[in-house]
């Protein structure tokens, strides 16, 4: 295993590499040290339940889940066999895909945090203006009167693509004026889709951090504008954390035990950190030390792992060590991590892995061939981490995971893909 200094050197060399967090402690101790608690996740979960009638009405594809924005958990035995045979993986337990790539509304994990942040702000405005009480039927938010009210307000967000889609789609459905500040990495089809929804898209020839800063500045100019801050938002974080509770139910439905003798290993693609950080926080609340969470990032944009391994969090960016931040995994093309997330998960996340763009496309193609499932490149990042961890015998032995390896359940969190146009899909699969 590499120490932190050696790992940073591997990052500079653009090698696919692994870092195991030396600071990870007990889940109880890590959670007790945080200002966020189970009560905060309770509150977020209850708010999503209140808005379910509205979501079901406006987004009928959610009717099967009663207006909840949720995705399937699918065992991918054929992909597991392919990884064992072609990438020398050593999987013994079951391998699952958490298909946030197919989340309704926005087709990515950002439908969790992004939609929740919009709904939280919406409820705050509605309560402050005495439009509703919490016991009311929230389907009233779909009426013309409510849409007219929210049209007085504007939402701003900086995004590489998927967060902008979730906030733009949900915000427009509620009647807001929405402006998405897009970095140079954003895909054209995502900009086109947002504009088709009536969202204003401002394009910048710079990276994600610059787009976020511009969004923050524009929102500050108008008292009726609200900036959804991907770098520092507690609301986004809690929206993602709710996912762990839903996952717990899905695992139980498939008779998957999670305890000390049946560890749960989860591999999550990471950009600025909000989604994987919130999910990690939620998993530790639900499963404690039986949950082992690992982040996966592109070799050119490993901002969160760089911040964690160096201990500098958001005081360092990937350009500081000679990397570009540019990657085909547009959702992960982030140069500087969230300091808020880094500080929150620094004693919870088990470690992380970097993956090349070429490897992403190999796994994207393999998933499609073996399981007939399509995800976008960034959503494949977790596979490389899962494979690498399975071969790290020293770490598995020292962490105690090796003793229960045959009982482990592995979840690769697929973060986006459902909205990718057919022409783009064909290009990805041909790459």
Describe each region flagged by the PLM.
Residues 1-431:
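PLP-dependent amino-acid enzyme catalytic core
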